[in-house]
Amino acid sequence: PPKHADNRRVFAYLRSRGVDAEIINHCIKHGQLYEDAERHNCVFVGYRNDKPAYGALRGTLSDSTFAGEAPGSDKRFSFAVPRCAGGKTLCVFEAAIDALSYLTLLKLRGQDWRAANTLSLSGIYQPRKDGSIRSPVALEQYLKDNPGVARIVLCLDNDGPGRAASAAIQKRLSEYEVIDNPPRRGKDYNDHLQMVKGISGRVKTRGGEAR
């Protein structure tokens, strides 16, 4: 979507959800986050060969529950921080805001958030009846593009679909060291961050994240 002249609503929304200002500004500076001109949604941008290839949308109004994708998005190239990945460990989340929340938690603990590699799957697939699951295309592509990854930390949601997806991915990627690391409190890492910071009034999302 076209960019708004500024990112004030996006910045204010993410700050209200507990995300650290430095991390928000980092994503804006590197072209990974902006405010869309028409609806003022957060747009979390994923890249392919330094060109935008994916956009996850999230409403910023106080009563908004919207989550979706920009038309023409290629989910293989989902939102990841940093854009230029490195290192052997990858932390995987269902949503972009959970990845940013995790980085904020690292900073609160005095750890170097810039050293972490995070990937949003932009939703998960529901497991099949036999318990198997389609491998998330964003994760498959990331591992293909970054063969140095040896350890995968699954930071998926603390609910039925998230737990089932985590178990299925662990089984599917047995050649890697896979660690299950759901949030200690709340449904997801943004929930956990808000609890740590004492923020209340979380709004659940609905809409176009793939399942």
Residue ranges and their predicted role:
Residues 48, 94-97, 158:
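Helix N-cap/beta->alpha junction signal
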Residues 84-90:
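A short, charged/proline- and glycine-enriched loop
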Residues 1-84:
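Basic, glycine-enriched DNA-binding surface that flanks or lies within the catalytic cores of DNA
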Residues 97-98, 165:
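Acidic, divalent-metal-coordinating active-site segment for phosphoryl/phosphodiester hydrolysis
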Residues 70-71, 93, 133-134:
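Conserved phosphate-coordination/catalytic loops
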Residues 11, 99, 170:
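Short glycine-/small-residue-rich flexible loop motifs, especially phosphate/cofactor-binding loops
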Residues 14, 44, 94, 102, ...:
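Terminal peptide-recognition signature
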Residues 88, 104-211:
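TOPRIM fold recognition
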